[in-house]
UniProtKB/Swiss-Prot annotation:
This is Neuropeptide B. It comes from Rattus norvegicus (Rat). The keyword Cell membrane does not apply. InterPro entries: Neuropept_B_pre, Neuropept_BW_pre. May be involved in the regulation of feeding, neuroendocrine system, memory and learning. May be involved in the afferent pain pathway. GO terms for biological process: anaphase-promoting complex-dependent catabolic process; feeding behavior; G protein-coupled receptor signaling pathway; neuropeptide signaling pathway; positive regulation of mitotic metaphase/anaphase transition; protein branched polyubiquitination; protein K11-linked ubiquitination; protein K48-linked ubiquitination.
Amino acid sequence: MVRCRTLVAAALALLLTPALAWYKPAAGSHHYSVGRAAGLLSSFHRFPSTRRSESPALRVGTVPLRNLEMRPSVRSLALCVKDVTPNLQSCQRQLNSRGTFQCKADVFLSLHKAECQSA
């Protein structure tokens, strides 16, 4: 019964068309988004002046990426999203929203500059 519900929820999620973009690139960014999940990683490419304010979730239990000490060689790495493969069996409905699901996904990244430019 649970598996049937999961399959029905996944089928409905695939049939519905997205209404709006789920992220917006930073204004004046010098980096281009690659792949469907590039918006999730766009903070790696932004300059401190163009970053959005911290969300309350970050303040509670995690350390924001910009406060971490990173070597210059790590900061200058090219990072691009090569592919995103969602795991529909891991999807769970969010309690505070009627049509929102949280799913796990495999995200394939590349740190090689040549691969990022060819994508």
